[in-house]
From Swiss-Prot:
InterPro entries registered for this protein in UniProt: NA-bd_OB-fold, RNA-binding_domain_S1_IF1, S1_domain, TIF_IF1
Disulfide linkage: none
Organism: Calycanthus floridus var. glaucus (Eastern sweetshrub)
Protein name: Translation initiation factor IF-1, chloroplastic
One cellular component term from this protein's GO annotations in UniProt: cytosol
HAMAP family: IF_1
Keyword Nucleotide-binding: no
Pfam families xrefs: eIF-1a
PANTHER family xref list: TRANSLATION INITIATION FACTOR IF-1, CHLOROPLASTIC
TM helices/strands, residue ranges: none
Length: 77
């Protein structure tokens, strides 16, 4: 049986080496996020200040996989 993963939204607060980021979730938790392979393959840039969707395992709630970069409301891209 496949493990159930929780999906949260958060804000990138800090960029770390090797595609890792510090993410502040909407419930104010601070976790470590890494970029999923699909985002890495598509060369999607993630910068501090971006809003993202992050997938967190129920076994380790301190790490998560960034699965989607949300569009900013004020930018035109």
């Amino acid at each position: 049986m496949k493990e159930q993963k929780l999906i949260h939204e958060g804000l990138i607060t800090e960029s770390l080496p090797n595609g890792m980021f510090r993410v502040r979730l909407d419930n104010e938790d601070l976790i470590l996020g890494y970029v999923s392979g699909r985002i890495r393959r598509s060369f999607i840039r993630i910068l501090p200040g971006d809003r993202v969707k992050i997938e967190v395992s129920s076994y380790d709630s301190t790490r998560g996989r960034i699965i989607y970069r949300l569009r900013n409301k004020d930018s035109n891209d």
